[in-house]
Amino acid sequence: MEYLEKYEEWCNGEIFDNETKEELLGIKENESEIKDRFYKDLEFGTAGLRGIIGAGTNRMNKYTVTKATQGLANYILKQEGQDKGVAIAFDSRRMSPEFSEQAALCLNANGIKTYIFESLRPTPELSFTVRKLGCIAGIVITASHNPPEYNGYKVYWEDGAQIVSPKDKEIITEVNNVTAVSYTHL
């Protein structure tokens, strides 16, 4: 699917909220902006996702976060780790609490227990919590050192460390293979 088709799908699709559609309609005359937002999917790399916050497949938003979380959920289910749960932390960046909630709702819809912090926490506290609670994984919503318009999504495994080979590649494969997501509404 070409970037203009993806743009139209996001502008008209029933699954996309009005706020997302309004943001995209605001750029309808700016083809270079549309192309930048839709020419590819935001890549789930070795440590997770990182990108500019906004509407589009190449941006950090609730839809790309949910897709990444669905891939992680699929991997956890294959490992039979749903009962161990996933700890979720977030920093002070824009949309961090919302993205952490999106991740929890997706994991819960897949039958995976979650432990989500009520307020912002540093990454080392997430790492400690994963080990202390015996979780199979952890997620931190943070863009670390990137500019303020960015946010990110980092995955940690049951040892409290960021995912490394071969798990990173296996999770990336699951994320890239997502065609549908499970989601629980509040």
Go through the PLM ranges and name each one.
Residues M1-Y3:
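Polybasic, low-complexity association/targeting segments
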Residues E8-A103:
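An N-terminal, well-structured beta->alpha segment
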Residues E8-G13, G81-E158:
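Ferredoxin-reductase
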Residues D91, E174-N177, V181:
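N-terminal segments that mediate ammonia production and transfer
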